[in-house]
């Protein structure tokens, strides 16, 4: 196969990987963690992935600690965790 053909194949495989939705087996383990506001008293509107409902939901984050199932935007949550 020519180098141009290899580059085309690599490009197509990369595009396929980017566009393929996340499946539950590919989902990071932290997506299964519950929402966790943490002990601080801030009022940050963020999103977490609810594995029971299979969707990203908003919650209030206090600003410290918590866990990794915490996203600034719903888009970031969906790209990382939603199938």
From Swiss-Prot:
Q: In which tissues is it expressed?
A: Expressed by the venom gland.
Q: Which GO-annotated molecular functions does the record name?
A: serine-type endopeptidase inhibitor activity
A Pfam family that the UniProt record links to this protein: Kunitz_BPTI
| Signal peptide per UniProt | 1-24
Residues of the BPTI/Kunitz inhibitor domain: 31-81
Which SMART domains does the protein's record reference? Answer: KU
Cite a GO CC annotation.
extracellular space
Keywords attached to this Swiss-Prot or TrEMBL record, sorted alphabetically, are:
Disulfide bond, Protease inhibitor, Secreted, Serine protease inhibitor, Signal
- Disulphide bonds annotated for this chain are 31-81, 40-64, 56-77
Q: Is the keyword Disulfide bond in the record?
A: yes
Report the transmembrane regions from the record.
none
Site positions for Reactive bond for trypsin, renumbered to this chain? 41-42
Could you tell me where this protein is found in the cell?
Answer: Secreted
Instruction: Note the PANTHER family from the entry.
Output: KUNITZ-TYPE PROTEASE INHIBITOR-RELATED, SERINE PEPTIDASE INHIBITOR, KUNITZ TYPE, 3
Functional description taken from the UniProt entry? Serine protease inhibitor.
UniProt record similarity statement: Belongs to the venom Kunitz-type family.
The protein, known as: Kunitz-type serine protease inhibitor nigrescinin-4
Can you name the source organism?
A: Cryptophis nigrescens (Eastern small-eyed snake)
What lineage is on file? Eukaryota, Metazoa, Chordata, Craniata, Vertebrata
């Amino acid at each position: 196969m020519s180098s141009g053909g290899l580059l085309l194949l690599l490009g197509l495989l990369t595009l396929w990987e980017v566009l393929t939705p996340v499946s539950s087996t590919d989902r990071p383990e932290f997506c299964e963690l519950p929402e966790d506001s943490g002990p601080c008293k801030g009022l940050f509107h963020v999103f977490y992935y609810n594995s029971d409902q299979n969707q990203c939901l908003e919650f209030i984050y206090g600003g410290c600690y918590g866990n990794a199932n915490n996203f600034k935007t719903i888009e970031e949550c969906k790209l990382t965790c939603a199938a």
